[in-house]
Amino acid sequence: MKIQTNAVNVLQRTSAYLKSGLLKETPAWYNVVASIPPSTKFTREPRFKNPSNGHIIGKLVDVTEQPHANNKGLYKTRPNSSDKRVGVKRLYRPPKLTYVEDRLRSLFYKQHPWELSRPKILVENEIGDENYDWSHMLQIGRPLDGESVIQRTMYLIKTKQYGDMVEAYDHARYEFYALRMQEETEQQVALEEAEMFGSLFGVSAIEHGIQKEQEVLDVWEKKVVEETELMAARTSNPAGSWKDDTTLNTAQEEESTTSENLHF
């Protein structure tokens, strides 16, 4: 099958169209593709290192260079399917992108799981983050959360105030603790002042949910008690007595009905 090179030659064909006059205006992507032209090599080459961190992800083993023989006294001259499977499976797989911020986030929320219960607006960090000055942790228009610790840590590393990641993270974490305690103290003082001046606060969303749940549990408890008493009454009396009582009641009702019909 002939190799399709139409997508690769898009820069050459567009240049020819511009030179001949078929295209009047230069496309917006033309200069970008011209500065970084697409590759013309169609053979897949194994990557032995992860380009993001430089770690070795695998290597090809030349079985012909092994000097020893197997248990049968034979020398291997070519790789078998199992040898190829081990190397090829990872060499041609695209490397996983890893970021330092993600490692710091996982560490912070693992140490502080209750921070995940706080309300949070999910937005991309790149949108508007260039306006924040992370020389201090408190930011105008941004609540104090775990992301503040991450960005503060990265700022300390980039400005070389701390050479060690652990020391920078601990410094940002201690700043976060102090600001969180100050925030909770201010909220508690504001609540006590409002109550002192006669403010009345309704139940919170959690308390409202607990009340509704308790109402359902009360109805369930009443129903269970009635069913339990009924089952205890049935098991304490023999089955025949229930049958005899039912037969006796039915006979009495029929007798009373007959007497009423015969009464003039």
Swiss-Prot record:
Region (Disordered): 233-264
Principal subcellular localisation of the protein: mitochondrion
GO biological process: mitochondrial translation
Any one Gene Ontology molecular-function term assigned to this protein's record: structural constituent of ribosome
Key word Mitochondrion present: yes
One term under GO cellular component: mitochondrial small ribosomal subunit
CDD domains cross-referenced by the UniProt entry: At1g26750
Origin: domain of life: Eukaryota
InterPro entries from the UniProt entry: Ribosomal_mS23_fun (IPR016939)
Key words of the record: Mitochondrion, Ribonucleoprotein, Ribosomal protein
Cellular compartment(s): Mitochondrion
Additional free-text comment from the UniProt record: Present with 1920 molecules/cell in log phase SD medium.
Function: Component of the mitochondrial ribosome (mitoribosome), a dedicated translation machinery responsible for the synthesis of mitochondrial genome-encoded proteins, including at least some of the essential transmembrane subunits of the mitochondrial respiratory chain. The mitoribosomes are attached to the mitochondrial inner membrane and translation products are cotranslationally integrated into the membrane.
Subunit organization: Component of the mitochondrial small ribosomal subunit (mt-SSU). Mature yeast 74S mitochondrial ribosomes consist of a small (37S) and a large (54S) subunit. The 37S small subunit contains a 15S ribosomal RNA (15S mt-rRNA) and 34 different proteins. The 54S large subunit contains a 21S rRNA (21S mt-rRNA) and 46 different proteins.
Family in the record: Belongs to the mitochondrion-specific ribosomal protein mS23 family.
Protein name (Swiss-Prot/TrEMBL): Small ribosomal subunit protein mS23
Record organism: Saccharomyces cerevisiae (strain ATCC 204508 / S288c)
Gene this protein is translated from: RSM25
